[in-house]
């Protein structure tokens, strides 16, 4: 099916929001201009809505295989499509881990069979993510690994991390890191700060993250490797990443929507839906994340979509697993709480969710260019809705944002020229 989207707005190559039509033919973007006419195309009047590149998320957890009670590739990618994401990168903390040919081939077959959006799987750095034996990077790359990570755990052995970075550099691949120094975790369930002290909970200190990042940055410099930092959360982490970039070290970084919108002061009680890793930090950390995003220290926004069952989250904040869902709330949360409040511009938000992650990892995504695959998201910036977890397509309903009123909701997502998800009656 060919589509002609009429009367929309998009961000042009100069970074300005302008009026446009957009023609999709044979799965490709055929033309982006005003007043397009075309035969043999279904006309969809978007009536002033934003025509954006499909959103790109480099940090997601789809749970399959091994955790299908939390999420599946089918439910997770449907949720991604509903959130406007057309390309997502799946972390390897599944069971089994994609750490060898057999496991990666099985995962790729599942993706091919079940995914509603583009899914790029990470390969594990170490076998079973156990930290002691390196995987076969060459084989995993051959089978389509997006990059290498042991996300969910930090690689504790510096010699292992250095060897991994050297091998990844030879393959022109990135090493992506969840940064925690295990000896500093302190059996914590929240940030070590006012909230942990008030509620008598073990806290995870900020330095647990930043000291690990500092170590890895020096290793990346020695290996001449692209090193990407997951879900930055502390002022100290922002500082060391900024210093590394100024020194010319190949480091990039991401931040989550929840760390941009919340800090520990916003946790109303010992509610497990506010338990994520890294935890919500202090006000100074939150301010540093915003500053880092604006000055280029932090390159992109990634959801760290981490679904869990209601039963798992009901165990209490000390026993419940870390993580919140992110696909279906990311854009409206960020648009409402950052763009509408004048903290960043709409153009910047689009870049942080599209071209910045795509360019960082060399993906042909993130821009509406003629000849490119038609991965597109239509967003109604005027639509206001209350976040209702019962309507999520994800199996995970674990969110701290239930009841929040937000503007800027995706209403249609196109993947490879086909409609992957559409809000009922939104574009009739």
UniProtKB/Swiss-Prot annotation:
Q: Which UniProt keywords apply?
A: Hydrolase, Metal-binding, Pyrimidine biosynthesis, Zinc
Q: At which positions is substrate bound?
A: 61-63, 93, 277, 308, 322-323
Coiled coil stretches, renumbered: none
Q: What class of enzyme is it?
A: hydrolase
One GO term under biological process is: purine nucleobase catabolic process
- SUPFAM superfamilies with a match to the protein in the record: Composite domain of metallo-dependent hydrolases, Metallo-dependent hydrolases
Task: Tell me its EC number(s), please.
Answer: 3.5.2.3
GO terms for MF:
allantoinase activity; dihydroorotase activity; zinc ion binding
The protein's required cofactor(s) are namely: Zn(2+)
Q: Which residues form the active site?
A: 304
- Function of the molecule: Catalyzes the reversible cyclization of carbamoyl aspartate to dihydroorotate.
Taxonomically, the superkingdom here is Bacteria
* Binding of Zn(2+) 1, residues: 59, 61, 151, 304
- Please give the name of this protein: Dihydroorotase
The cross-references to HAMAP family, in alphabetical order and at most eight, read: PyrC_classI_B (MF_00220_B)
The protein's matches in PANTHER family, at most eight in alphabetical order, are given as:
ALLANTOINASE
Q: Name one Pfam family in it.
A: Amidohydro_1
Which reaction does this enzyme catalyse, per its entry?
(S)-dihydroorotate + H2O = N-carbamoyl-L-aspartate + H(+)
Gene3D superfamilies assigned: Metal-dependent hydrolases (3.20.20.140), Urease, subunit C, domain 1 (2.30.40.10)
**Chain's gene name:** pyrC
Instruction: Show the GO cellular component annotation of the record.
Output: cytoplasm
Q: Which organism is it from?
A: Bacillus thuringiensis (strain Al Hakam)
Free-text cofactor note: Binds 2 Zn(2+) ions per subunit.
Give residues annotated as binding Zn(2+) 2: 151, 178, 231
> Could you tell me which pathway this protein works in?
Pyrimidine metabolism; UMP biosynthesis via de novo pathway; (S)-dihydroorotate from bicarbonate: step 3/3
The entry's family comment says: Belongs to the metallo-dependent hydrolases superfamily. DHOase family. Class I DHOase subfamily.
């Amino acid at each position: 099916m060919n589509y002609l989207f009429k009367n929309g707005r998009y961000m042009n190559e100069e970074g300005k929001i302008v009026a446009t039509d957009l023609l999709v033919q044979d799965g490709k973007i055929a033309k982006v201009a005003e007043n397009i006419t075309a035969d043999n195309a279904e006309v969809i009047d978007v009536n002033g809505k934003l025509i954006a590149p499909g959103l790109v998320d480099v940090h997601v957890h789809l749970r399959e295989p091994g955790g299908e009670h939390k999420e599946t590739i089918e439910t997770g990618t449907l949720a991604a499509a509903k959130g406007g994401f057309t390309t997502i990168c799946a972390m390897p903390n599944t069971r089994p881990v994609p750490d060898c040919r057999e496991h990666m081939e099985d995962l790729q077959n599942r993706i091919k069979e079940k995914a509603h959006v583009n899914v790029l799987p990470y390969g594990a750095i170490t076998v079973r993510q156990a930290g002691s034996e390196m995987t076969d990077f060459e084989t995993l790359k051959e089978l389509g690994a997006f990059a290498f990570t042991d996300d969910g755990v930090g690689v504790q052995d510096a010699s292992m991390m250095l060897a991994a970075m050297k091998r990844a550099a030879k393959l022109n691949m990135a090493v992506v890191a969840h940064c925690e120094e295990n000896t500093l975790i302190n059996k914590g369930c929240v940030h070590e700060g006012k909230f942990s002290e008030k509620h008598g909970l073990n806290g995870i200190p900020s330095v647990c993250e930043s000291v690990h990042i500092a170590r890895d940055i020096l290793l990346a410099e020695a290996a001449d490797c692209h090193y990407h930092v997951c879900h930055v959360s502390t002022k100290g982490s922002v500082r060391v990443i900024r210093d590394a970039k100024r020194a010319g070290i190949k480091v990039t970084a991401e931040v989550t929507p929840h760390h941009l919108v919340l800090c520990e002061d916003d946790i109303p009680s010992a509610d497990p839906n506010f338990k994520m890793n890294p935890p919500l930090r202090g006000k100074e950390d939150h301010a540093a994340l915003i500053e880092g995003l604006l000055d280029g220290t932090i390159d992109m926004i990634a959801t760290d979509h981490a679904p869990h069952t209601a039963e798992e989250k009901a165990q209490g904040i000390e026993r419940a697993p870390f993580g919140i869902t992110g696909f279906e709330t990311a854009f409206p949360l960020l648009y409402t709480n950052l763009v509408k409040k004048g903290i960043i511009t709409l153009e910047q938000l689009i870049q942080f969710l599209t071209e910045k992650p795509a360019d960082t990892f060399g993906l042909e995504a993130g821009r509406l260019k003629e000849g490119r695959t038609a991965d597109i998201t239509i967003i109604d910036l005027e639509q206001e809705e209350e976040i209702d977890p019962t309507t999520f397509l994800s199996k995970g309903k674990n969110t701290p944002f239930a009841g929040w009123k937000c503007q800027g909701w995706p209403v249609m997502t196109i993947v490879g020229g086909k409609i992957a998800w559409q809000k009922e009656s939104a574009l009739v």
